[in-house]
Every structure is written in structure tokens, then in C-alpha cells.
Amino acid sequence: MLHSSSDASPADRQRWAERRRSLETGRYRVSPDGRRGWRRKRAFDLLVNLFGKLLQPTPFHALGRRNALDLRLVELELAFPHLPAAFDGYRILHLSDTHLDHFPELASVARGLLAGVEVDMLALTGDVHGNHRAPIARSIGLLAEALDGVRVRGPRLAVLGNHDPAAMAEALEGLGFEVLLNRSLVLEHAGQRLHLTGLDDVNCFYTEAALAALAVQPDHDAFRIALVHSAEMADHADAAGCALYLCGHTHGGQICLPGGRPLVTQLTRCRLAGRGLWRWGSMTGYTSCGLGVSGPPLRFNCRGEAAVITLRRRP
């Protein structure tokens, strides 16, 4: 299987990095709907961490930790009438929100879960990092441990999340990933093509380059997949002709009501796409519940996961 990418020039990459770092240190977080101060998010994070500390003396804390370590492998078959026949049966391992530096015990659990999994592509939709103050090398090392037993026949693709600093792109490339920063890649097999567009995080670090990347139409009749950290570009991706949208960010709620209803999704828009399978117009989407956790290392009514998605051609 061949693949080619719309590689950014070194100058383009440098401009992206400078802009990203400026946003990371700025006064505002920027989403497709505009900019907002960091104060509200920081206040929310403090409340979440306080909740975790209040639970520590209770049996619920130990239960929540056990739940967070109880990962599952989700297997899905998604059928599309216009999927190229050469890609019928194409398998994608979708991971998101690993945050392994925040809960290192998960790395060995994930390694056991994923051992022996064979796929054609690995798609990592951001938030490799957890603790903003921790060195990213730890996150990368733990991710390498988690993926040790996975066999990936084709590309390893990644996008960045709101917890990932600009330096994470180079670190992931050192691990064998191709990081799509508002650009596209074409996979070709038996003369047929898949077109993949990956965006930098849009929840906190949105720029017009994300929308521009989606707006670029393939010069061929390709099946198009969007890789984005959050579901917040779902409407734009559907309008651009994407057939499949893979994302994470919400952790499925992480701490949910019975039945799995999220209390919070941290989405500023496209909120109906907060968990699992969904439809937006003619596009199918999947929002991962995430492998890891943020805030207190707890889960309730929402298991962490990795997903193997098999593409099928529907007659």
C-alpha cells in the first residue's frame, strides 16, 4: 500500500509552531466559535480535582480507580456505499486521550489489551500528554510501552490535542507517527484511494488553518476521513464531504450517571457528538471514551477504551 502526504515545508512547520506556542502562552483559548479566557476552565479543573480529593477517604475512590484500569477493546464494523472496494475490510486502531503520564499504571494494562492486535492503520486523535508540567518524554515512553504488542501494517497517524504542547509533534514523529497538522494524506491501494485530513486541536488552539485544511477538496473521487481531537469541527467536515470523523477529547464523560450519561463533555459546539457512534448529516463519526483519564484518576459508568474499526463497502 502506498501513501503520499501534502507535506508542509520547514517554513510552514516553523510558522505553525510559533503560532501554536503563542496560543499556548496567551490569555485566551480559541475555538471555532471565538476566544474565551482560561479562568473558567481553570476553575472547572480545580473543582474536578477537589471532587477527587473529597472521594479519597471513601470506598468510591478505590472503586473509581479500579474502573479506570478496566479498559475494553471496542470492535466496530462501519459500512459505506462509496468506500473503494480495495479498502473493504481495512482495519483502523483508534486511540485517543491516553494521558499515560497522569496514570502510569494504565500503560501495562493497555499493553495487555492491545497485545496481538493487527490493523492496517493506527489513528491517534490527541492528548497523549496529561500533566502540563511533566516532561513529554514520559508520556512518549509510556505510549511506546502501551503499543509494544500492536502490529500496524500501514501508517501510524496522529493529531494533537489540547493537552499536547507543540513539541509533542516532534516527539510523536520520533515514535514513528506521521503528525497531521492541518494537512492531508492520501493512501493508495490497487489504484484506489483514501484521503485523510488531520487537524491541530480546535478546542483551545483553533486557527483558520484548520478550516482551510478541510476546505481543500481532493483532486480525485476519494473516500475522506477526518482525524480531529474533538468533535467540534463535525459540521464543517460533513460540509467538506468527509465520510468518517474520528475524535476523542470528552473521555465519554469519564464520570457519568448510571446508563453512561455524561455530566460534562467539555465541548463548545457539536455537543450531540460527545460519545460513541453518531451521525452528522451524511457523515458517520466516532468519539472515543479515551484510554486514559484527566483530573482524578477515576471513572464511573464509562470504561476507558481502544477501538478497532473495520471499514466495509456496503452494496
Cite the ranges covered by each PLM segment.
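Active-site neighborhood of phospho(di)ester-bond hydrolases with catalytic His/Asp-centered motifs
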Residues: 93-96, 121-127, 155-162, 180-183, ...
